[in-house]
């Protein structure tokens, strides 16, 4: 098994979602982090007050101001306003991609394509694809083998999808082993009632 399985899964997701470019990651939260770091966004972030806890934790980790919009009702995906980054962890669907967005998917427990762990970024920019893919893979360019032959490294993170997960995801997508879309309508707790310390 080699890195070509990652590109195979990227192509399968591209065809399924309608996104021209797909970057695989180890989680949706890390996909969101990569997008915000890549955009060098340093302003405030507005989230719905009901979402999974890892997203406000990430905003705190990045040192960004966080505000909650208690009137923001969402299904399947929401925007990290005012950016073009979307938490699409529960939105995986055929032809779901919207141009101009960076939509971040999850393949974790309970998600439509439940690989076990993993995420992806959908984008319409080839440049974004190459930079984000390098960032997700320790600053490595995966076509250079062995990696020790690479001379220049941009800042990278160990947020890559494992090869085994890509193979499993591709098989599940091909066999249409997706959970029912309605199973993705989850009631999250009110995050206005929590405090993040540290």
Question: What do the predicted segments below correspond to?
Answer:
Residues 94, 102-198:
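Active-site region of PLP-dependent enzymes
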Residues 7-45, 55-62:
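Phosphate-binding glycine-rich loop
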Residues 1-11, 72, 171-173:
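A structural motif shared across PLP-dependent enzymes of the aminotransferase-like
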Residues 20, 43, 80-82, 101, ...:
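Short coil/turn segments at beta-strand junctions that form active-site/ligand-binding loops
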Residues 13, 31, 45, 63, ...:
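Generic structural signal for small/hydrophobic residues in well-ordered secondary structure
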Residues 3, 26-29, 49, 126:
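Alpha-helix N-cap/helix-start capping motif
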Residues 36-95:
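PLP-dependent aminotransferase-like
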Residues 24, 68, 104-106:
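Structural signal for conserved beta-strand scaffold positions within catalytic alpha/beta enzyme cores
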